[in-house]
């Protein structure tokens, strides 16, 4: 057995498997996209069997690319799209319905009904979350109500509920392990983040039988052993975290006040608040950053639904660019005198507005506006929304360590120097891009590798984190203030109550 660690990164649009060597460098990668199902407007589903097949395929690819065998792998770490719900038969392991994805909005009216019953404060107090279709609990409730016989079977213990990590662990271990980790549990609307246990009162409101829920473990723990028939050898599963928490770990944000932001399909910013459960007054989420050695570390989280997805829209919808890589160069050519704002509320607005009925809009168009100005507006929208999150976080929690805010970034969009410089300018804060951009997979791998004893401990891992480049703010205050005012005006005009 070598110092190799396998990370399975099961995302929203694709599955990636990455083999890291003993020096925490990428040795082999496998990736496979899978089908997005849209049965009705606002509904998004995945086929759990297709996801499972993609995991087997990508793991095989990654091991082959690394030039090793499964016997050389010391441990497996899993990270996953959060909130997405799978329910399967405990005997056969077969799903009873497609997975309902985090983006799915079918339970919006149910969430509104719970709000009218004045239950949002209770859910927020217990879980740190808001009553929004984004989270798992109402999706599970919908499945139990709409799949024939599901609720009765669940009460008898015949069905299992899980986020994607739980389903994959079940399959990888041949049905021997029915477990999740604290970060994934904290996104379900059913987990009490203070007591670190499933909340019986919330389960009763959502009409979810406790018999169908998995055991909750630390992020670095013994989650089971892979079935030897899958990869040719047994491998212990020793690390699990939801994707944004895994990225926080991969960015070595272990100290209070450290902050990371991931720019993928959406944008997710997490601020480490240590052992303090900070209750947001600005509609941010209070969530579990990680739980290690029985100690829970908390975070404030801001979720933006559309980030890289806006660039995809420019490419696939408007045909304004040929590839996402062109966006920074085009934005650089935009007329600096034209102030165009794009509010990408394609599926409503996330934090800190949480307005599912807001709709996208472009403001400031003139006869001279061209593709360059639209592209710049799309990239700037990501930066403006990040500023909204940072402002809300500062209101909720003043930096406890007295240091300036430095944002560590990762995800596909951070390869653009132009976007990262504009982000630093509009945040008025330094932005650090790491040398390893696979931070989500790296975080899952570190959880497993450190548990296996083949990778460094927390302190050693933090020291090994390396910066590729720091982007310092270079915009003058007058220009920045004017731009931020224009953005706030644009957002106000897109809000459903505006």
Swiss-Prot record:
Binding site for ADP: 12, 16, 265, 308, 412
Gene3D superfamilies in the record: 3.30.420.40
Amino-acid positions noted as binding ATP in the UniProt annotation, renumbered to this chain: 12-14, 265, 308, 312, 412
Keywords assigned: ATP-binding, Glycerol metabolism, Kinase, Nucleotide-binding, Transferase
Residues binding sn-glycerol 3-phosphate, per UniProt: 12, 82-83, 134, 243
Family matches, as SUPFAM superfamilies: Actin-like ATPase domain (SSF53067)
Molecular functions per Gene Ontology: ATP binding; glycerol kinase activity
KW Transcription regulation (keyword) present: no
Biological processes, Gene Ontology terms: glycerol catabolic process; glycerol metabolic process; glycerol-3-phosphate metabolic process
Keyword Repeat: no
Stated regulation of activity: Inhibited by fructose 1,6-bisphosphate (FBP).
Domain of life: Bacteria
GO CC list: cytosol
Residues where glycerol binds: 82-83, 134, 243-244
Enzyme Commission number(s) of this protein: 2.7.1.30
Pathway involvement of the protein, from the record: Polyol metabolism; glycerol degradation via glycerol kinase pathway; sn-glycerol 3-phosphate from glycerol: step 1/1
Catalyzed reactions per annotation: glycerol + ATP = sn-glycerol 3-phosphate + ADP + H(+)
Task of the protein: Key enzyme in the regulation of glycerol uptake and metabolism. Catalyzes the phosphorylation of glycerol to yield sn-glycerol 3-phosphate.
Family (UniProt): Belongs to the FGGY kinase family.
Protein name: Glycerol kinase
